[in-house]
């Protein structure tokens, strides 16, 4: 183990024997850290720093935290410390598939580090000796994370709408269609009703803001481009999308001259920036590339992707 990748987390009090045993069951699991330096305390470990003092279920806030925190692998547990290996972009690592619920991994797939959407209790360790609860993320195949995010957002969008207009939709029907993820023929419950909505609401605020700005930033030259591409044998989809443009957009794009070049260039630059921002929201980071997976001992060799 390289010296600069080793992180020692000191406990305030000695761990009880049963706590050591529970933590040893998590050896090989991914652990988020608030800081990156080599000596830390328990208050910087796990998902608790993302939530403050109260351990709620704000999974969107946890997602944001996981995309910026330091990730490490739990290697060793003693009565007064945890030893971890920090994950960097240029290393290869051994991790274990010890998460709840269990999702089958395979060689040559990408897995995603995400909040414990399915079962928070089974992915946490209560350390009464230190008055601390270690809440860990789960690591699942990326398609699982994609579907989970899709359904969390859909549920929260409908929840927000029905809070303003109670008759807009039946939340029981919405919940029935969004409260699970299907993988390899199995259904896994998401427990959406128990989710805190503040983080999701802030997430939706950002999403709506960026989408509105992007519409406003659409350069008039881009709108004109759709009409100038009109030709014999064009792609049929192009004509379909052309009819979707509002008339006022076409009117605004009617006149192109030297005075419109700089504003359009500025808009394109801003449009690229907001597209990148939206991409950062939905890129399911952080991700790991699994090169080999051994089902017998649940061990995987992987490296950090993003």
Curated annotation (Swiss-Prot):
GO terms for cellular component: host cell nucleus; viral capsid. InterPro entries: Herpes_capsid_2. Keywords: Capsid protein, Host nucleus, Virion. Pfam families: Herpes_V23 (PF01802). Structural component of the T=16 icosahedral capsid. The capsid is composed of pentamers and hexamers of major capsid protein/MCP, which are linked together by heterotrimers called triplexes. These triplexes are formed by a single molecule of triplex protein 1/TRX1 and two copies of triplex protein 2/TRX2. Additionally, TRX1 is required for efficient transport of TRX2 to the nucleus, which is the site of capsid assembly. Interacts with TRX1 and major capisd protein/MCP. Belongs to the herpesviridae TRX2 protein family. This is Triplex capsid protein 2. The lineage of its organism: Viruses, Duplodnaviria, Heunggongvirae, Peploviricota, Herviviricetes.
